[in-house]
Amino acid sequence: MKFSLACLLALAGLQAALADPATCEKEAQFVKQELIGQPYTDAVANALQSNPIRVLHPGDMITMEYIASRLNIQVNENNEIISAHCA
């Protein structure tokens, strides 16, 4: 029983680590084509399948590690989407 639980937890972590970079690229294009100028809301976050998603606000300090499957959404001071890319 303990072994099964440990395996399930390990698989859950592995799924996040192996997220598909192609999904991120498709979603970045969708955001650029359909959501530029729209407010970033929970509904937007829930509609996107990329994992993880990082929202970048003006003046945010960010780490520079490259994660191909991570969707970065840049917003302005009014929380409106201005850009998206994978990294």
UniProtKB/Swiss-Prot annotation:
Keywords: Disulfide bond, Protease inhibitor, Secreted, Serine protease inhibitor, Signal
GO annotation, cellular component aspect: extracellular region
A Pfam family: Inhibitor_I78
Residue ranges the record marks as coiled coil: none
Subcellular location per the Swiss-Prot or TrEMBL entry: Secreted
Temperature section of the record: Stable to heat treatment. Retains 33% of activity when heated to 100 degrees Celsius for 10 minutes at pH 7.5.
Keyword Secreted applies: yes
Bridged cysteine pairs (disulfide): C24-C86
Protein name in UniProt: Elastase inhibitor AFUEI
The species this protein was found in: Aspergillus fumigatus (strain ATCC MYA-4609 / CBS 101355 / FGSC A1100 / Af293)
